[in-house]
Amino acid sequence: MLAALGGLGLLVLGVRGLDLGALATALAQVDGGWLAAAAALQGLSLLFGGLAWRVGLTAGVARLPVRHVVGAHWIGQAANTLLPARLGEVARVMAVRRHVGEGAPVARIAGSLAAQRLLGGVASFVVVVMVILVMPLPGLLGTFRPWAGGALGLAILMALVLPRLGLGRCALGMVPERLRGVVANVVDGGRVLRSGRARTVSLVIHMGELGAQLGSIIALLRAFHMQVPMSAALLVFCLLAMASLLPSLPGGLGFNQAAVVAPLGSLYGVGAPVALAFSLGIQATAVGVALLGGLVAVCHERLCRSHTCRGAAAGRAGAVEPSRRAGRRPRPGRAHLVP
């Protein structure tokens, strides 16, 4: 809640003293073609996110059709744009639960989602570190290279050492008895973390998701006619990835603007109205694509539910009719009449 209020405060501070006329001009001059390309790449990013979650569900819960998992992923993303603190993840879990059946508890589905989020965070961390290490960054950002290299080395060391220490078993033993079943289901749902092949496939898909997000940012820079180098797009991508880790207003409103406007102005000389218009364009593109895809997914879920109900009703009617016929006595016909 405090983080959400902080995001709102940052948004209010960013708007105060701003030339609203210049902001309106920047929004009015946006290129529609590049904006459509950014929206398409944002949709592709959400598709990759759903596919990555399906890999985790297959490893830890059940094998589900792609359309149901991608639809649930899109519903959750749409709910995140309307609810604060990423509460839309609950809608994501409940949307996919009806397709799993009664055999898998909610905790196992939530475990698969948590594992997918963890792998997505690992992919984002690797991309951010590689950007800092490889790309020429302006100003003080270039001094972050030793820290980025140290963070990468520490992460690799932890990935190699922690699985051998058996800390998971010790932590599970410290859980109260009444909660061990829930924790065990969560761990079972995150089985993708222990499956080498599934983990690799999921990480590759997450890399595709991040690549689509970066492409969407580049297209939006072109849409707002911002003449900045490639490092600006990478910087915006990294800042938005870090801002997404904080619970905030619906869709990350406030934190996203604070993460984009000041760095673009101080490092690349972009005016505050244009930078704010660009950040609002990022926000509007993400929200619009999520809501449109979520609406389509909800309609698809309702159609599937109606077809399922009709099939079940037809099956019950078909089962009742033979039983009625079996219990019915034959009517006397002409052959049974006595002349």
Where are these regions (language model features)?
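Membrane-interface alpha-helices at helix entry/exit sites of multi-pass transporters
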Residues: 66-71, 89-90, 101-116, 270-281
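Hydrophobic alpha-helical transmembrane segments of ABC transporter permease domains
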Residues: 114-133
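Transmembrane alpha-helix interface/packing and boundary motifs in multi-pass membrane proteins
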Residues: 76-85, 238-257
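Hydrophobic alpha-helical membrane segments of integral membrane proteins
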Residues: 94-95, 110, 123, 204-205, ...
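Discrete transmembrane alpha-helix packing/kink hotspots characteristic
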Residues: 83, 123, 289-293
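Interfacial segments of multi-pass membrane proteins
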Residues: 96-100, 236, 258-274, 278
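Predominantly cytoplasmic-facing regulatory/coupling regions of multi-pass membrane proteins
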Residues: 1-74, 133-245, 270, 277-280, ...
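Extended non-transmembrane interhelical loops and adjacent amphipathic helices
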Residues: 55-58, 70-101
